[in-house]
Amino acid sequence: MSAKTDEILESLKSLSLLEASELVKQIEDAFGVSAAASAGVVMAAPGAAGGGDAAEEKTEFDVVLESFDAAAKIKVLKAVREATGLGLGDAKAMVEAAPKAIKEGVSKDDAEALKKAIEEVGGKVTIK
């Protein structure tokens, strides 16, 4: 690889999860592409080849906000904003659109942590 691509790779390795998410959104906007479409295709291939083993090998999960207590709406909104890095308006729209996927394609540990954080403040979450 060239020195320039090596430098970019090292910079990417140092990004936090939130920064990486923001970078993906900026790349999608700048180049008119969608990371979600290609991830869905990649996930479909192992399931088709593996047959019954697909459920055991699942490594990416979607965290879905199913509902929330009306009294806890602000706390749920704050938890969603913290987890996604969205602005207030976008996070509010996401929470009010429940049931809605909050995060997609995350590891099991991250999904469980997010579920716990949102349920602690009054949201009902499922992991798919």
Curated annotation (Swiss-Prot):
Q: Which GO terms describe its biological process?
A: translation
What cellular component GO annotations does this protein have? cytosolic large ribosomal subunit
Q: Which GO terms describe its molecular function?
A: mRNA binding; structural constituent of ribosome
Q: Where is the signal peptide?
A: none
Give the stretches traversing the membrane.
none
Q: What top-level branch of life does the organism fall under?
A: Bacteria
Q: Which UniProt keywords apply?
A: Ribonucleoprotein, Ribosomal protein
Oligomer and partners: Homodimer. Part of the ribosomal stalk of the 50S ribosomal subunit. Forms a multimeric L10(L12)X complex, where L10 forms an elongated spine to which 2 to 4 L12 dimers bind in a sequential fashion. Binds GTP-bound translation factors.
Q: Which PANTHER family match?
A: 39S RIBOSOMAL PROTEIN L12 (PTHR45987), LARGE RIBOSOMAL SUBUNIT PROTEIN BL12M (PTHR45987:SF4)
Q: Which family does it belong to?
A: Belongs to the bacterial ribosomal protein bL12 family.
Tell me, in a sentence or two, what this protein's role is.
Forms part of the ribosomal stalk which helps the ribosome interact with GTP-bound translation factors. Is thus essential for accurate translation.
Question: Can you say what this protein is called?
Answer: Large ribosomal subunit protein bL12
